[in-house]
Amino acid sequence: MAASDIAGRVEEMARPLAERKGLELVEVQYVTEGGRRYLRVFLDKPGGINLDDCEAVSRELDRALDDVDFIPHSYVLEVSSPGLERPLKRAEDYVRFKGRLVQINTYAPLNGRKKFSGRLMGSGEEGVTILLGEHELATIPWDQISKARLAVEF
């Protein structure tokens, strides 16, 4: 079973579990690092999550995963916050974080570049609009966004 398939199945299991606890499932990753496999589940909620939130989801998800036992290898389950540089995955994320500093990478160059950093000004059918510098707006089409995340403001 491919890593993306495993992550997808775990996401289907974890999303309702997180929502019952008032949490948002941000992302699920199944990766191999240094010869070990990790199943990473990232959660959030307004105001941020705490250790008790992570522990509760980890405990329930671990039991559920043991019951269905579809992951063919041993792995380490990690449940945590997405951190300050949280990924932006869904259209709702762009609405929620309007006004924040973001970093967006594209699949192909747009106006000669593939990396954009700026203030998230909005989103719509055509894509995401960010303010680059003081006066330059850039609209990045949805289908060109390969990776987007919040950026830390100092």
UniProtKB/Swiss-Prot annotation:
Keywords (alphabetical) are: Cytoplasm, Ribosome biogenesis
Domain of life, per UniProt, equals Bacteria
> Where in the chain are disulfide-linked cysteines found?
none
For this UniProt entry, what's an example GO CC term?
cytosol
Q: In the UniProt record, does the keyword Plastid occur?
A: no
GO-annotated biological processes: ribosomal small subunit assembly; translation
Q: Does the keyword Cytoplasm apply?
A: yes
Please state where this protein is localized: Cytoplasm
Q: Which family does it belong to?
A: Belongs to the RimP family.
HAMAP family associated with the record: RimP
Could you tell me what this protein does? Required for maturation of 30S ribosomal subunits.
Record protein name field: Ribosome maturation factor RimP
The organism of origin for this protein: Desulforudis audaxviator (strain MP104C)
